[in-house]
């Protein structure tokens, strides 16, 4: 086997460059508040995304899948393996296979390094585009006006970037080919990708007066491309399976969140009589009742769902949360503890239980559970922020500062991370072992900071732990 000499694109846009730029864009998207911070939705997307990635034989890429609160039908791949899916697209899918098909396509854009290859193919124009994109990101991160922030987000989500970077027709076909192979290997219907393309194409054909779905403008879909996708799917065994419960749970939660008011969500789920609804529709109804403060009605549904199926974590979480809202802490804790015994170290469950424990005045137990989860399961930024919140409520101020620093690092804010660590070093009750740990962390972070970031750090103001109450 010949040694890997690398790609010509690496000379202009290396994998490290992609990772760094991806982190910057993600920092801006998170700052906009558009990332859906729902642990059940996030875990689901990463679960099926990981199944697809496992079929690509690309161990060199780290992937993060996340949902973006946006009714437009679109998905996008960012440098560094960040895959974003609009809530509008998830709602538009008719099956889990279609959603998996979209994710497989976006994963292929990353594994085939299409952005880097496009930069190499047209380096002058693409580097200018990259410079413009980074300028928008920096402006947004620096607190520029809303137009600048929205412009940065639009670029990051692909409405501008994918047009400016200009994925070629060859790249789109390659993403389809590689994606369909991964789709089939992961156990999904290989026709899922073509099926979603057809839905988008049909929507535009039957309603030409409507604006084309964002997905079709950033990922042009032609009749020939649909036919090619279907032809490639024939090379793989036909897989027919029901949608997973997790797919239905995620869609139901996003549907409830999409309404302007909880009352509208309740109206939506009450259109059909309860006895005619399936379990997912009943779950959506319970979530809507919960959001609307109709806790007794929600509790009745969760009890009904758990009597039929105890294997769905979301049902346990919903019941526990509702019992807390009904001021029944003993029953709530018993519900969560029983669920923990069934599903140890499940991230959405531990997060939901820990939030309720803090609310019920037991932050020490919450802190213990969250640290155990952190040591065994890769965390999300919001999960680390919750550790800081639990530590603060438990009187562990130094640890609260430390984990707020880690949260800032996870969202790409190195300056903010050092800021929190430096404040922790000023605490009079700081233990020597903590001082050594915090100083070592600061030294480690500095190695990754630019001269400009180091200057910004010198002029930054202390932020304290007030943000934990937001």
Across the structure, where does each feature detected by a protein language model lie?
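Membrane-active amphipathic alpha-helices enriched in small hydrophobic residues
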Residues: 127-142, 151-160
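Active-site recognition of the HExxH zinc-binding catalytic motif
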Residues: 85, 101-109, 113, 175
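Catalytic Zn2+-binding segment of zinc metalloproteases
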Residues: 97, 107-124, 142
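Extracytoplasmic and endomembrane cell-envelope/extracellular-matrix remodeling and assembly machinery
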Residues: 5-12, 23, 35, 43, ...
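Canonical tetratricopeptide repeat
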Residues: 284, 318, 352-353, 386-387, ...
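Catalytic zinc-binding patch centered on the HExxH motif and its immediate surroundings
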Residues: 67-81
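Short pre-active-site segment immediately N-terminal to the catalytic Zn-binding motif
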Residues: 84-101, 163-170
């Amino acid at each position: 086997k010949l040694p890997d000499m690398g790609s010509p694109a690496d000379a202009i846009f290396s994998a490290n460059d992609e990772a760094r730029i991806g982190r910057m864009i993600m920092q801006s998207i998170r700052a906009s508040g558009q990332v859906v911070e729902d642990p059940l939705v996030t875990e689901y997307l990463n679960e099926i995304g990981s199944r697809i990635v496992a079929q690509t034989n690309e161990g060199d890429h780290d992937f993060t899948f996340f949902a973006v609160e946006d009714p437009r039908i679109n998905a996008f791949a960012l440098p560094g393996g960040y895959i974003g899916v609009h809530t509008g697209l998830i709602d538009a899918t008719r099956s889990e296979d279609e959603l998996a098909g979209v994710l497989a396509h976006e994963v292929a854009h990353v594994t085939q390094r299409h952005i880097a290859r496009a930069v190499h193919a047209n380096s002058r124009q693409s580097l200018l585009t990259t410079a413009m994109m980074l300028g928008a990101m920096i402006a947004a991160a620096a607190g520029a006006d809303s137009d600048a922030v929205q412009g940065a987000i639009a670029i990051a989500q692909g409405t501008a970037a994918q047009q400016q970077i200009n994925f070629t027709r060859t790249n789109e076909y390659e993403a389809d080919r590689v994606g369909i192979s991964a789709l089939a290997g992961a156990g999904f219907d290989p026709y899922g990708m073509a099926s979603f393309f057809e839905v988008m194409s049909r929507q535009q054909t039957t309603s030409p007066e409507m604006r084309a779905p964002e997905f079709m403008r950033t990922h042009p879909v032609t009749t020939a491309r649909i036919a090619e996708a279907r032809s490639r799917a024939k090379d793989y065994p036909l897989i027919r399976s029901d949608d997973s419960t997790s797919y239905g749970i995620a869609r139901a939660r996003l549907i409830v969140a999409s309404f302007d008011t909880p009352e509208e969500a309740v109206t939506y789920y009450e259109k059909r009589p309860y006895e005619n609804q399936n379990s997912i529709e009943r779950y959506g109804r319970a979530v809507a009742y919960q959001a609307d403060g109709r806790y007794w009605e929600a509790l009745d549904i969760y009890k009904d769902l758990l009597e039929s199926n105890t294997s769905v974590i979301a049902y346990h979480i919903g019941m526990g949360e509702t019992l807390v809202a009904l001021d029944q802490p003993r029953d709530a804790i018993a519900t969560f503890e029983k669920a923990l015994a069934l599903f140890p170290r499940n991230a959405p469950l531990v997060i939901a239980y820990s939030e309720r424990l803090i609310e019920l005045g037991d932050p020490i137990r919450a802190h213990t559970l969250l640290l155990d989860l952190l040591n065994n399961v890769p965390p999300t930024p919001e999960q680390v922020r919750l550790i800081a919140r639990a530590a603060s409520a438990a009187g562990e101020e130094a640890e609260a500062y430390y984990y707020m620093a880690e949260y800032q690092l996870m969202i790409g804010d190195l300056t903010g991370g050092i800021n929190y660590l430096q404040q922790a070093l000023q605490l009079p009750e700081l233990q020597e072992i903590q001082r050594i740990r915090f100083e070592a962390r600061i030294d480690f972070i500095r190695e990754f900071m630019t001269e400009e970031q180091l200057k910004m750090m010198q002029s930054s103001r202390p932020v304290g732990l007030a943000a934990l109450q937001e």
